Amino acid sequence: MIARIWSGESPLWRLLLPLSWLYGLVSGAIRLSYKLGFKRAWRAPVPVVVVGNLTAGGNGKTPVVIWLVEKLQQRGVRVGVVSRGYGGKAAAYPLLLTPETTTAEAGDEPVLIYQRTGAPVAVAPERAAAVKAILAAHNVQIIITDDGLQHYRLARDIEIVVIDGVRRFGNGWWLPAGPMRERASRLKTVDAAIVNGGVARAGEIPMQLAPGLAVNLRTGARCDVAQLSNIVAMAGIGHPPRFFATLEACGAHPQKCVPLADHQTLAPADVQALVGEGQTLVMTEKDAVKCRAFAEDNWWFLPVDARLSGEQPDKLLQHITSLVR
């Protein structure tokens, strides 16, 4: 229903317009207060790069963060990552991730980024506190914040927006009548707009999510996902249909697709109940970090990597590395 409202297919969005106007006025006033200096943002002693969205819902932001961290690491840059830690609840904040940190404490995306990149990762509702925790424990040269475009309390040097190239901005309205956290005109002020799928427009960086080999959660064995049979697909991400379409494109044809809420807590019994005798469970990598501790032999995940095309990605990386002292 939400997808139909935000796309404009359902007329119910009109009933939510008063709340959307209120949301837009409040969010605009907050941004203006920082822009005019009525409120002060905290500036870190190292450059800060924000990777965020203008819309609610999954746009492919986490793969972009991983891509950016890995590309900077390849250039010899010491990178730290901060996040709000959605879906997690730590005993105390800021929380600096360790190999023992669970998704229940830090959230699924921070744990995934930590495991994929090995970069220092910290979570806190107040992102400045997370930055300070990393700087106190690690000699990093740059901070990447996973989400937080609208978190103006943290000053930033580079802003990168990730856009779903198929859904783009839906009906164009602020939450809750539409998907917008800020108006599309905000694109004029960011440093880069990366478009996941669909057709990129002038000045935007095209991106595709490239699937790798399926990985067994228990053994680490790898195989072409099309070789798996009797698949039940599970996706607890911002836009589950994207994952199901990826499986189809890879030649894997699920018998059943189970969409879950983004950052949803997964109980062992609930996940086990999805898979019948002789079936194979295939999930996203973000779900896998929550399920690995209780995984069965026939559970697999399909990793995806961001692939950015054209000359603009290299120019963006050069611009970012030029800020590093």
From Swiss-Prot:
Binding of ATP: at which residues? T55, A56, G57, G58, N59, G60, K61, T62
Tell me the keywords, alphabetical order.
Answer: ATP-binding, Kinase, Lipid A biosynthesis, Lipid biosynthesis, Lipid metabolism, Nucleotide-binding, Transferase
Q: Does the keyword Acetylation apply?
A: no
Which GO biological process annotations does it have? lipid A biosynthetic process; lipopolysaccharide core region biosynthetic process
Q: Which InterPro entries match?
A: LpxK, P-loop_NTPase
Organism ancestry: Bacteria, Pseudomonadati, Pseudomonadota, Gammaproteobacteria, Enterobacterales
Q: Which gene encodes it?
A: lpxK
Which HAMAP family would you find in this protein's record?
A: LpxK
In UniProt terms, what function does this protein have?
Transfers the gamma-phosphate of ATP to the 4'-position of a tetraacyldisaccharide 1-phosphate intermediate (termed DS-1-P) to form tetraacyldisaccharide 1,4'-bis-phosphate (lipid IVA).
Q: This chain belongs to which protein, by name?
A: Tetraacyldisaccharide 4'-kinase
Q: List the disulfide bonds.
A: none
- GO cellular component assignments: plasma membrane
GO molecular function term, any single one: ATP binding
The EC class name is transferase
What family classification does the UniProt entry report for this protein? Belongs to the LpxK family.
Q: What is its EC number?
A: 2.7.1.130
Catalytic reactions on record: a lipid A disaccharide + ATP = a lipid IVA + ADP + H(+)
Against NCBIfam families, the record matches this protein to: lpxK
| Associated pathway | Glycolipid biosynthesis; lipid IV(A) biosynthesis; lipid IV(A) from (3R)-3-hydroxytetradecanoyl-[acyl-carrier-protein] and UDP-N-acetyl-alpha-D-glucosamine: step 6/6
Keyword flag RNA-binding: no
